[in-house]
Amino acid sequence: MKKFLRVFLIFIGVFFLASCGSKIETKTFVGSPQYGIDSTLTYTYQGDKVLTQTAKNIVSYDKLGITKEEAKTALEPVSKQYEDIKGLDYKLTYEDKQAIEKLTINYEKLDYDKAKKVDGIQIDGDSSKGISMKKSQELVESQGYTEQK
């Protein structure tokens, strides 16, 4: 009975410690609108390791001084570079007054070598250790983003 109780308490202790360290959290950063583009970045992370990052950009045709057709001509080649890269999910939709671009990066599945070649994706340091939430936050805040709480 003592042995069973001891094993049970050890199991509960290990389970408790594992559950404490595995909390998945989210942080969202909003960029100040520049050049007719509203940008929001959302990070999902565990500890200091970023699991996913989602960038949502809303591009106003009027603010850029272009038409919907001109936006398509300019953005279609950009959207092609995201195709066939494991870990990237890219969607671009055109509405009447704006285009909405959404890019989700799953760092657990990402083909880092291919992703590094894409314009706008910046991966510094040793990616085999994962992407640091702390460093990501410092980077986006240095670029004018503010955390949305």
Listing of model-derived features with the role each one plays in the protein:
Residues 22-149:
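Subset-of-secretome marker
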Residues 1-6:
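Positively charged n-region of N-terminal signal peptides that target proteins for export
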Residues 16-19:
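C-terminal motif of bacterial Sec signal peptides marking the signal peptidase cleavage site
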